[in-house]
Amino acid sequence: MAVPKKKTSKAKRDQRRATWRRQAALQAQRALSLGKSVLTGRSNSFVYPEDEDEDED
């Protein structure tokens, strides 16, 4: 069975966790910003289909 040769230090463990948490926080911030822009109608990167059936009548 494969096992690590040496125990990972607490500093290395904390450094990795800090990196993961920083990346998660950045993604959460981007998602929140994107959601806000969609809700306020300021986003230009989304194309919404318009109902043309109502206009033709």
UniProtKB/Swiss-Prot annotation:
GO terms for cellular component: large ribosomal subunit. Residues 1-20 have a biased composition (Basic residues). Keywords: Ribonucleoprotein, Ribosomal protein. GO terms for biological process: translation. InterPro entries: Ribosomal_bL32 (IPR002677), Ribosomal_bL32_plant/cyanobact (IPR044958), Ribosomal_zn-bd (IPR011332). Pfam families: Ribosomal_L32p (PF01783). GO terms for molecular function: structural constituent of ribosome. Residues 1-24 are annotated as: Disordered. NCBIfam families: rpmF_bact. Belongs to the bacterial ribosomal protein bL32 family. This is Large ribosomal subunit protein bL32. It comes from Gloeothece citriformis (strain PCC 7424) (Cyanothece sp. (strain PCC 7424)).
